[in-house]
Design a protein with these regions (language model features):
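Transmembrane beta-barrel architecture of outer-membrane proteins
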Residues: 6-8, 71-73, 119, 164, ...
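Short, solvent-exposed, mixed-charge loop/turn linkers that connect secondary-structure elements
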Residues: 136, 156-158, 177-227
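Charged, alpha-helical scaffolding/interaction elements associated with membrane systems
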Residues: 16-17, 154, 229, 363
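Compact, aliphatic and Gly/Pro-tolerant "microcore" segments centered on a short helix or tight beta-hairpin
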Residues: 43, 48-53, 57-148
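Repeat-solenoid scaffold signature
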Residues: 153-182, 384
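Small/polar, glycine/serine/threonine/aspartate-rich low-complexity segments that form flexible
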Residues: 1, 11, 50-77, 200-219, ...
Length: 384
């Protein structure tokens, strides 16, 4: 729309909207999960430090107890997962896909917020525009009422003409409160979208009376292109990818996990701390295999497969709904464009007819009903 005031409102809403803050928090959580999954492929380290007092309660030949001995254990070990079964790789893929799904959900919230702000802003401007238009028509009808009253007093009109003119004025005035209510409702919604109480709506928007206009045709492209841009489609697709990766995570438990590790150990009596003969080391593969629990692992695999099947069904439903919504929106946009062009022509024609009817009535060439009808047609065309 190239409207700086509208752009500023959208920016404020994107910063302050509570739903968007929650979506941003979900994205930060997904980032943390990705870091956690990626960190599983790095070196693991552990440190051991232990000290004990060992006492032998046997007695010597002299009848005294044996003295206690202080011992210690110090160790440092390093392990690195080889990921031969691909479990860590699939876990990372799943977390990345989950993050992309959360990001798509956040994008959907952003689009919804921007669209809601734009609609609320347009509703305020439209309500003011419609009210101003009706007030102009009321002014014309008031002039007609004044003229018919003057004609009646001069003996050239009837009380019926005056009552019909007054009815037209009052009928038009009766529509004004509806525009006020529509404007207030849109302002309250706008305040809520900006993260404020309804009464704290932006005061400068309240007086907006110029309808937002597209500066260029909407770049809709075709239906397929619009669907590819939809965040709900991306979210559903990335959800499938994440849950598919978790099938690999569950399947990997059917096979052993292998790590390579090594460590340095220093233990013995405290007085030997640091001496060469108290050091030792270890190096080799570490094997872990849950083969006794294979039925449990297979159950997890079945559950993961069922989850993906459900995701695919939901994806199909989302795509069908997106196709319906996209085609409906494109058709509505095209027909609204045609309707706007027709209403523009109708408004111009109604304006000419109203002016002609007023002139003919003034010179006694037309009756009052024709004038009131022309003015009503003008009001309807302008409001639409």
């Amino acid at each position: 729309y190239d409207d700086p005031r509208l752009d500023a409102l959208v920016e404020q809403a994107l910063e302050a909207n509570a739903n968007l803050r929650a979506a941003d928090a979900n994205l930060r959580r997904a980032d943390a999960v990705v870091r956690e999954a990626t960190g599983q492929k790095t070196l693991g380290t552990s440190v051991l430090a232990d000290a004990d007092l060992e006492r032998d309660y046997t007695t010597t030949s002299a009848g005294t107890n044996m003295p206690g001995v202080l011992t210690y254990d110090l160790g440092f070990s390093v392990t690195y997962p080889l990921d031969l079964n691909g479990k860590l790789k699939r876990a990372i893929e799943g977390s990345l896909a989950d993050r992309e799904a959360v990001e798509a959900a956040r994008d959907a919230v952003r689009i919804s917020v921007a669209a809601a702000v734009t609609k609320a802003y347009a509703d305020v401007c439209a309500a003011n525009y419609q009210q101003a238009t009706v007030e102009k028509v009321i002014a014309l009808q008031q002039q007609t009422l004044t003229a018919t009253t003057r004609l009646q007093r001069g003996g050239r009109g009837t009380a019926f003409d005056v009552s019909r003119s007054r009815t037209a004025v009052e009928t038009s005035k009766a529509s004004l409160p509806a525009f006020t209510a529509k404007r207030k409702a849109a302002l309250y919604l706008l305040a809520t979208l900006l993260g404020k109480p309804p009464a704290q709506y932006p005061a400068d928007v309240e007086s907006c009376a110029a309808l937002p206009r597209l500066r260029s045709p909407m770049p809709v492209g075709d239906g397929a292109a619009m669907i590819r841009r939809r965040p709900d489609i991306r979210q559903a697709e990335r959800t499938i990818a994440g849950d598919t990766a978790r099938i690999g995570v569950a399947t990997a438990d059917l096979y052993p996990t292998v790590s390579i590790g090594g460590g340095i150990i220093n233990d013995g009596k405290l007085e030997n701390l640091g001496k060469t003969h108290s050091f030792g080391f270890s190096l080799g593969p570490l094997l872990n295999w849950s083969f006794p629990n294979r039925p449990v692992v297979k159950a997890r695999i079945d559950a993961a497969n069922a989850q993906v099947e459900g995701d695919i069904a939901r994806f199909d439903a989302v795509v069908l709904d997106a196709l319906r919504g996209t085609e409906t929106a494109l058709e509505t946009y095209a027909r609204d464009t045609d309707r706007a062009a027709a209403l523009g022509s109708a408004t111009s024609s109604a304006g000419v007819s109203s002016a002609q009817a007023a002139k003919l009535f003034r010179f006694g060439r037309s009756d009052l009903l024709s004038l009131l009808t022309a003015q009503a047609n003008l009001a309807s065309a302008q409001v639409n």
